[in-house]
């Protein structure tokens, strides 16, 4: 019987779809799957459902004798050696679109949390408490009417821009290509990175990762930002040099930061945890019931298509 191996628990809606068609084995151990367990799991599998936290390198691919598809449960796919998979005639798919609203919502939530000191205020209220309302007490920054600079105006970046416009924000964006139709629809302005860094009050990273973006935001870029600016990263961790971010915060080169992704994920640079003006979330960009169920359906349906001889919808290689 055709076999599918899943590298970690996924929502039942996708799991049940797969079980209707194939023999399914799913890793259900404590923590993330280790390499040897994954190698053993894919040895006789026709399909692998991988997670963003699952490293699928050449060694893993070579361990699979029958593999036809790697369906990645996530919009990103930099955890997979997609080029080598193609050399082995293995399709790699992802789950685009499903993450858009959830991640855009979180991006705006991070902006509000760090600018209005919501997390800091929650901690104060639960611990020492406060003496009451006072004119100079616990001031933050308003979001309405400010300028947002979006790095990566793809689906998620575009959704962030639409939400920002509801706050009467001016929208700047940068990326490898200008998107004139989206500019007109949203009311955004295309600028180069330096112009964005110098003018934005909130800089959001919503780009997918590729090696050319490694440490795109480094000491030089922090030095170009306003001293009242905030950096928001809901894209990919390695786009930001976290040590340079720590130094920028130490030197008050920027006012604060909010991160959902990390350079050395799942490890978080310890120094970041000490700043009250930094909000940290555990990579929950698309962690909603709606998005995760949709992602499960996508990986299941693309796997079913491939193993039934049809072309998957979301091939990335």
From Swiss-Prot:
It holds the Pfam family 2-Hacid_dh_C. This is Putative 2-hydroxyacid dehydrogenase SERP1888. InterPro entries: D-2-hydroxyacid_DH (IPR050857), D-isomer_2_OHA_DH_cat_dom (IPR006139), D-isomer_DH_CS (IPR029753), D-isomer_DH_NAD-bd (IPR006140), NAD(P)-bd_dom_sf (IPR036291). CDD domains: 2-Hacid_dh_13. Its EC number is 1.1.1.-. The active site is at residues 236, 265, 283. It comes from the Bacteria. The keyword Acyltransferase does not apply.
């Amino acid at each position: 019987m055709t076999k599918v191996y899943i590298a970690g628990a996924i929502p039942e809606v996708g799991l049940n779809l797969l079980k209707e068609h194939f023999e399914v084995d799913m890793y259900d151990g404590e923590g993330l799957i280790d390499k040897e367990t994954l190698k053993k799991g894919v040895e006789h599998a026709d399909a692998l459902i991988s997670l963003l936290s699952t490293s699928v390198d050449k060694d893993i691919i070579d361990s699979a004798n029958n593999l036809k598809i790697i369906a990645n449960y996530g919009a990103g796919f930099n955890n997979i050696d997609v080029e080598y998979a193609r050399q082995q005639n293995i399709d790699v798919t992802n789950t685009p679109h499903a993450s858009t609203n959830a991640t855009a919502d979180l991006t705006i939530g991070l902006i509000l949390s760090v600018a209005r000191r919501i997390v800091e205020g929650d901690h104060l209220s639960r611990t020492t408490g406060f003496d009451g309302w006072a004119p100079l007490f616990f001031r933050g920054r308003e979001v309405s009417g400010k300028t947002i600079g979006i790095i990566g105006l793809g689906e998620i970046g575009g959704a962030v821009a639409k939400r920002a416009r509801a706050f009467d924000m001016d929208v700047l964006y940068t990326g490898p290509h200008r998107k004139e139709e989206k500019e007109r629809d949203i009311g955004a302005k295309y600028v180069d990175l330096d112009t964005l860094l110098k003018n934005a009050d909130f800089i959001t990273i919503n780009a997918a990762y590729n090696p050319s973006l490694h440490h795109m935001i480094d000491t030089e870029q922090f030095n170009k930002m306003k001293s009242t600016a905030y950096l928001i990263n809901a894209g990919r961790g390695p786009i930001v040099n976290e040590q340079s971010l720590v130094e920028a915060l130490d030197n008050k080169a920027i006012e604060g930061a909010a991160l959902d992704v990390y350079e050395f994920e799942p490890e978080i640079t310890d120094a970041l945890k000490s700043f009250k003006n930094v909000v940290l979330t555990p990579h929950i960009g698309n962690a909603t019931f709606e998005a995760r169920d949709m992602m499960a359906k996508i990986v299941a349906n693309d796997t079913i298509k491939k193993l039934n001889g049809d072309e998957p919808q979301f091939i990335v290689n």
